[in-house]
Amino acid sequence: TQAHRETTPFYFRLEIKSHMPLDKKSTFARRFSAEMERLSGRMLVNAPSDYEIELRLLEKRDGGYACFLKLLSIAPGRFAYRKNAVAASIHPATAAMLVALAEPYLKENAQILDPFCGVGTMLIERDIRVPAREKYGIDIFGEAIRGARENASYAGEKINFINRDYFDFTHAYLFDEIITNMPVRGRKSKEETDAFYSRFFEKSAGLLKADGILVLYSNEQGFIRKQLRIRSDYRLLAEQCIREKDQFYLFVIQYKG
């Protein structure tokens, strides 16, 4: 753990992710920043264009906020394990944030699966936050699997990575949890994406235990909500907007069995 011992002020930037109208959000941000300056004795100074600290407030479903802090003045070491990445890789800081938000729904010693694991970041961050017993990562992209194995080794994680299509995957026992960064649509049509999500929910129902959990990061809110409407075997537990600009959401969904 590293910390600063300084006598001069730190400059910060505030970012708010909420459903507030823009004018109210701007007013709230100004008042919040001013109060931060006052309470810190001006050791924290609002400087949106030249800052050392980034504060991010994420509105929760109950109306409260989760607060995240990023120190840009300390060299990153927390995510040094991520030596390999591919184009679709999630940033490890984002993965860590998603797992932190989903933590109330996660359990220790679970058997977990990432069906589109890429270079393994979601599984690694999940196990760091809440240790699991058995961890499986699947990806159709061989280069990603090779990178995932190396990243897991650097992180000191024991994860079973398999180069396979999720829809062809079978296993001897059921899983407590499926956690994944869902593939982006790319060049797929709406009809193809709709069919993909239908297949995904059907396949996952065959791999999850009763009361098992889906933790999904996706910008296809409409297709996920459609599956929740037409399928009685799933129930939405939590939904959180993460990136408002391009509509990426975190979903926590229970499989009722």
Language model segments and positions:
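Class I S-adenosyl-L-methionine-dependent methyltransferase catalytic core
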Residues: 19-23, 28, 43, 47-52, ...
